[in-house]
């Protein structure tokens, strides 16, 4: 969204928040939907290294469609409210995963729980659609072995 018009992107460039000594920057992984998990991990590591070294170019931070912000590395365990980076219309916040007792219908068993927070511009994304996206993401994360194939 640019304030007056909705711009539908035909690509999926995903930004991720990177904490540096100079402040927060958001490098962008281009065409993330066309890359394997390994390629995504390698590219994120390379961009994060450039960010830490202060060597990101302006083009490394342009064109994002969606941003992921993780405070888990800073020890934040509960959900937080990430702020959408305009002109994007959504951002996913990820907190620190912890093992918690979860009732499985018969007993409590230890389960890894990952708090997620999705913020989105309601002028563009209907609340129910946002909730369905988050539910889809949770199901994908619960079946990581399938995602990694």
Annotate each PLM feature:
Residues 1-149:
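C-terminal catalytic/motor cores of large multi-domain enzyme assemblies
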């Amino acid at each position: 969204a640019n304030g007056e018009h909705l711009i539908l992107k035909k690509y999926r460039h995903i930004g991720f928040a990177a904490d540096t000594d100079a402040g927060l920057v958001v490098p962008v992984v281009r065409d993330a939907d066309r890359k394997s998990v390994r390629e995504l991990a390698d590219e994120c590591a390379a961009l994060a290294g450039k960010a830490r070294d202060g060597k990101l170019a302006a083009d490394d931070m342009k064109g994002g469609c969606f941003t992921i912000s993780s405070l888990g590395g800073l020890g934040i365990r509960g959900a937080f409210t990430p702020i959408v980076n305009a002109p994007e219309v959504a951002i996913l916040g990820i907190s620190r995963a912890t093992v918690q007792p979860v009732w499985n219908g018969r007993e409590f068993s230890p389960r890894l729980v990952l708090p997620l927070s999705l913020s989105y511009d309601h002028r563009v994304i209907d609340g129910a659609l946002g909730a369905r996206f988050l539910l889809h993401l949770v199901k994908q994360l619960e079946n990581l072995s399938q995602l990694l194939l």
